[in-house]
């Protein structure tokens, strides 16, 4: 089992310069290999095998950076090709842009070249770097590699990859369960009738973003003022992303602590985000990220996440009598049934999702536990 820990690092001036060179060299090698592979395939119909070592003689400055970072660029390109041939919808490998505000490189731990001790991190070529280690790491874990990244706000982070023995999770009996229905206006509505008071981080910052975008439009493209303003906008987006991620981590932890079984719908978030009616809401809510957090947190706790088929008519089934309502428009926010049941559409769907999840597992519950 692999576990990743992400920490903030504080490189000095020379280390920042080294990171900048490494980011550039990794991008150069990746793009060079991709270009040669494409050209060779178009001419011969065969796949070209190429390694970063080929370029070091022609471009001696590649020797100034961590060689393992260049090797990982090759591996990342191979992965991109494999992903494309496995599922063409992911798209053909693309060239890496110099203008991307987020930059990174990956290196491997070989013969102790990466070390973490006394609030400092040792990296190949860079030496010792100050690190903000906000959580402890089990001594039994084995350090395998590190990914150094520079975010849009110019802050540096390191993601440390550790190998750990797969723990024997004690599978807990299902005593408490909950169903979650994705909501456009909120993050979700649960089967207990609770609505999340979701802080729409992106929408709250839209006015400020629009103001900064207008200022950018008045700058001459490519000028120092233009680049400075562009970086300011990127920093604002990075801040919004961190706010959203922090909230989703806390919300998924709360649910994991209270419930043994969580039932959700399998939604195609990519398709939903492309819909002009609610694309912004899908991106702002971060439902896909939220379910990913839920999945691994529940698994580590020995609990279960059940995904209901996206074609299951959770919104159209009456949670009281079980009757299927054939006509239900998206704008109908209240569910009304001939049996007399009248309730919020999303609450009704969440109850049905929970029941369907219990049915799939073959579990019956006497009572449900609410989040306090």
PLM region spans:
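Nucleic-acid substrate recognition interfaces
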Residues: 1-372
